[in-house]
Each structure stands twice: as C-alpha cells, then as structure tokens.
C-alpha cells in the first residue's frame, strides 16, 4: 500500500487516514453512515470497513454505540485501528474474510450491520491492487447480504449502499430473510437518473417495500466546487454530520 494521507470528514470533525492512491472512501461512506438508523447504546458491525470512514462517521453522529468492523485487507484494517485511536473512537477492528468470519465475530449479534460492497463484478481490472480488491468483488453480493443477516439480532437492520444497476440483485438476496425494505435512490442532480441507492431492510421484517424520492447531491447543472455545489440536504449530511431521516422508527 502507498503511504497514507489524512482527510477531513464531517466538516473536519474527523481526521481519517487513507491511502494516497487507490481505493479511498468518500461521500458514499458518509451517506451510508447517515442512513443507518442506529440509536445510542446499540451494536453496529460494518462489513468491509476499509479505513473505517463509514463506521467512524456513524460513531461521531450517534454517541454510545458499540462499534465493530471487519476488513479483508490487513493494511486497511491497520488504518482503521489507527483512525479509531487518533479520533478517540472505541471500535473493535477485525481482519478477515466475511465468508469465514473470525470466531470473535461469529459469537456476536448486532443491532445493525452496514456495508458498502464492491460496486463492480469480478473480471474488470483495476490498476491498484487495494483499489481492485475494494471496488471489484471477490465475494458475490448475495454472500455479503447473507453474512450481514447472520450477524443481526432478530429485528436488526441491514443498511447497504450499492450501484443502482445492482438493485435487483440486492433485493433478490434479501428475499425471504428480511423485509420492510426501504430504498433511497441517490441522484447527482435533480432530474438525473440515480446512480446509487441506499437499501435498508429489517431481519424478519414483514412491512411492504418503500421507494423514497431521490436524495439529490448537487444544485448546479454542472460540477464546480463541492462546498458551493452541494444541496442543503447534502451539506447537512457531508459537512455537518446529520443523519438522514427515513421514517424507520
């Protein structure tokens, strides 16, 4: 892995180390954290936590959470531990494969599991090994879903962000095991097709599916400066660390 650099998140509230090149978490991780309906005192596991951006953004927003992360790549797991320590966040970071979880995780149950599974299927090359592992799946999306559901307590919540063209695959994986599905499309600009979606499902839930209006990230027709271009809602999430109220509780 190339030398890491520190990036500010939530308006500088967090200072998190990530590789200078290759896979780096950004707005998607912050959006994932904002959508998780966790409450103080609950237990949260992130699958594929990388350097811990989503997990620690969630921990910064909701006090008193019991945080755990699972990361395949040792270098990223090491950065997550460093980030937790330097930002004063208590978290247990485990290095291992979600298909064969470490025994310490297999013995636990969580109120929430969050994940940003690889966006691309296997077979597409990436120039950087770390980026390739993070962005291109070696474990099928359905296995991510099953692994997350196994770690949830009954009635627990699974929160996932994924590309919109894999939404059908994700919903099929949830069928029969989780319900009360809520889908929040994420569009770059008003009137544009959504490129991402956050999907939240409850283990054992029976409520009907809900499709929400898109969350729009940018105001202007073309991209200029992030700080000026973000919608008010996106500013509140990305810069101020606010949550996204999806009406789940």
Placement of each model-derived feature along the sequence:
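Short, low-complexity, intrinsically disordered N-terminal peptides in bacterial proteins
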Residues: 1-9, 86, 223, 243-249
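Conserved beta-strand segments of alpha/beta enzyme cores
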Residues: 15, 66, 90-92, 179-182
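Residue-level signal for inorganic ion chemistry
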Residues: 32, 116, 144, 201
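Mobile active-site "lid"/loop adjacent to the S-adenosyl-L-methionine
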Residues: 117-150
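SAM/dcSAM-binding transferase cores
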Residues: 193-249
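Conserved Class I SAM-dependent methyltransferase catalytic core
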Residues: 21, 140-194
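Class I SAM-dependent transferase core
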Residues: 1-39
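Conserved SAM/SAH cofactor-binding pocket of Class I
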Residues: 34-127
């Amino acid at each position: 892995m190339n030398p890491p650099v520190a990036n500010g998140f939530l308006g500088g509230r967090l200072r998190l180390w990530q590789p200078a090149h290759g896979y780096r978490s950004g707005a998607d991780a912050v959006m994932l954290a904002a959508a998780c309906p966790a409450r103080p005192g609950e237990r949260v596991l992130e699958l594929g936590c990388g350097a811990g951006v989503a997990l620690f953004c969630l921990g910064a927003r909701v006090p008193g959470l019991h945080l755990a992360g699972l990361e395949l790549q040792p270098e990223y797991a090491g950065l997550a531990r460093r980030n937790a320590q330097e930002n004063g966040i208590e978290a247990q970071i485990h290095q291992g494969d979600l298909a064969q979880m470490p025994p310490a995780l297999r013995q636990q149950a969580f109120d929430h599991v969050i994940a940003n599974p690889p966006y691309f299927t296997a077979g597409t090359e990436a120039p950087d090994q770390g980026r390739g592992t993070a962005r291109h799946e070696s474990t099928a999306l359905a296995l991510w879903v099953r692994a997350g559901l196994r770690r949830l307590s009954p009635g627990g919540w699974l929160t996932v962000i994924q590309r919109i063209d894999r939404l059908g695959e994700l919903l099929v994986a949830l069928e029969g095991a989780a319900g009360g599905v809520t889908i929040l499309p994420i569009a770059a600009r008003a009137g544009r097709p959504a490129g991402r979606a956050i999907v939240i499902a409850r283990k054992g839930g029976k409520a009907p599916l809900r499709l929400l209006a898109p969350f729009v990230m940018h105001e202007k027709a073309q991209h200029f400066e992030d700080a000026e271009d973000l919608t008010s809602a996106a500013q509140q999430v990305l810069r101020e660390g606010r949550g996204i109220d999806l009406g789940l509780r």
